[in-house]
């Protein structure tokens, strides 16, 4: 995005940011949702059946917190770098840290580990909102609403398919559900042409076919 801003100013930056944000959403949102969906069989494989119940319940919250943190760090906070607003960046990074401390003090004494998980996810959510709001003062970045909605729909259908699959347990369930989820998500995203993905795939295939036809006779 820095190169786009230097080459073509804010119009070029907007196009580059839109493309980057769309790609990020289409790639990371299903990864986070998929991780949450296979939390129990993943825990069975990683820590064994005895500890899988507790560990499986932790995975969805880790996935949510990780996704919010990634979107904030690798997209939303870039507004301050592009706008050369270092002090605002520092202030914005302090928001989730402060929120986490406050929520930990409030929730952990009452809810224990669950409270820690809730406070972590909530603090990253607060940080994302703060970065989005303050970032518009530094360098407004577009929100890829179309890709976000299409990815959300694809994730919902993926979740429905995975949740409808019987629980085989262990590595078999993990492989089956992960494969099914990836297949459903990929088909829906291609069908909706989210982020222009289907158009790009079609263009690449047509280009390869044209090259093959022009090959040695």
Give the residues covered by each predicted segment.
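Hydrophobic alpha-helical transmembrane segments in multi-pass integral membrane proteins
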Residues: 33, 101-105, 156-171
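Specific pore-lining/lateral-gate transmembrane helices of multi-pass inner-membrane transport
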Residues: 1-94
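Short helix-capping/hinge motifs at transmembrane helix termini and TM-loop junctions
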Residues: 38-43, 47-52, 84, 107-111, ...
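Residue-level signature of transmembrane alpha-helical entry/exit and packing/kink sites
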Residues: 19, 54-58, 116, 143, ...
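Short runs within selected transmembrane alpha-helices of multi-pass transporters and secretion channels
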Residues: 57-84, 88-108, 113-135, 177-182
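Membrane-proximal transmembrane or re-entrant/amphipathic helices at the cytosolic face
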Residues: 163-217
